[in-house]
């Protein structure tokens, strides 16, 4: 027993001594970044952009691994189960980190407690858009029109639990709208049907709808942001349109719970370096996105955002009775 006790205590001591050493050497090999959505989507685009710059700051390659399914929760569950050594991190979004607990009764992670928060990666405001044939020209008239039509108007979204689904629930609830909700498999088909005149409207990330707005194939009423976007400067903000509605999608970087603090701090520093990079800022502007600033950066800023978004979104989802079994 004495020998076993000695080995056990010695092993614990060795682990305790090795943890700081591992943190000092970190990273000594490539880092896997789990993106819980398909390649080419908004989260994937941002992950690759920021990951490349973070890799330069850290002196190692960040390798994106796309693990889609179950509204992004499959990939985030994989991240929770990874070793807390800093070599597997993930980029979730508003859906996986705020809406998921209300949508998935059997969710295998708690966004507020199951991760070591690294930081907010970007914000992308929602844009209110419709098919060209809708007989409205401004946001107030649009809301009044949709309200008057009830379920005779269709709302297209990218699937249950998607950003456009959640944003639509919040928007529709705030203004008393009761459209017929039509789920699609992704944003692309929604916009294709909108251009074809088969879907009346959606509230989606500006990143997704900027090409159609510029091409003039859909109507744009407003962006739900405090300021206009430089990529679509003619589209007013919701405030300018006389409507009180601010809503941004966001992406966030997390690591498995119990990742050493020193390693998290290195990831935070690398993320901030990436967000301050002029090339990243320029690309964000093209995408209609922006980086967090000041106190919104880092683990505390992300934790505050997750907590506030869960509080905002949960009542709306529960009232709508939406569940994913």
Go through each PLM region and give its residues:
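N-terminal (or domain-start) structured segment
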Residues: 23-113, 152, 176-205, 212, ...
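Positively charged n-region of N-terminal signal peptides that target proteins for export
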Residues: 1-5
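Hinge/capping helix and adjacent helix->loop/strand transition within the periplasmic-binding protein
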Residues: 81-87, 102-189, 240-243, 250-283
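An extracytoplasmic/periplasmic, membrane-proximal ligand-sensing/linker region
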Residues: 28-30, 261-325
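Short beta-strand->loop
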Residues: 110-120, 178-182, 200-201, 210-246, ...
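Bacterial N-terminal signal peptides
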Residues: 7-18
């Amino acid at each position: 027993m004495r020998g076993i006790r000695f080995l056990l205590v010695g092993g614990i001591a060795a682990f305790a001594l090795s943890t700081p050493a591992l943190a000092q050497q970190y990273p000594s090999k490539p880092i896997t970044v789990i993106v819980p959505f398909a390649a080419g989507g908004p989260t994937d685009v941002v992950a690759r952009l920021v990951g490349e710059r973070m890799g330069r700051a850290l002196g190692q390659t960040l390798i994106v691994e796309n693990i889609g399914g179950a509204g992004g929760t499959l990939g985030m569950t994989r991240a929770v189960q990874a070793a807390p050594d800093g070599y597997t991190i993930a980029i979730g979004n508003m859906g996986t980190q705020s809406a998921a607990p209300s949508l998935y009764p059997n969710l295998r992670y708690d966004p507020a407690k199951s991760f070591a928060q690294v930081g907010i990666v970007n914000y992308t405001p929602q844009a209110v858009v419709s098919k060209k044939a809708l007989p409205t020209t401004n946001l107030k008239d649009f809301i009044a029109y949709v309200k008057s039509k009830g379920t005779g108007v269709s709302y297209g979204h990218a699937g249950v639990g998607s950003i456009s689904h959640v944003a639509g629930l919040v928007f529709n609830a705030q203004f008393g709208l009761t459209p017929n909700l039509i789920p699609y498999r992704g944003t692309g088909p929604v916009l294709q049907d909108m251009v074809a005149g088969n879907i009346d409207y959606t509230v989606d990330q500006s990143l997704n709808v900027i090409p159609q707005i510029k091409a003039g194939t859909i109507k744009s009423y407003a962006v739900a942001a405090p300021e206009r976007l430089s990529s679509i400067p003619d589209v007013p903000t919701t405030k300018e349109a006389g409507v009180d509605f601010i809503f941004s999608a966001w992406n966030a970087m997390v690591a498995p719970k119990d990742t050493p603090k020193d390693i998290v701090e290195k990831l935070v520093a690398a993320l901030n370096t990436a967000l301050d990079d002029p090339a990243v800022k320029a690309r964000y502007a093209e995408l209609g996105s922006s980086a967090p600033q000041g106190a919104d950066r880092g683990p505390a800023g992300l934790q505050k955002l997750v907590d506030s978004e869960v509080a905002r979104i949960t009542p709306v989802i529960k009232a709508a009775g939406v569940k994913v079994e």
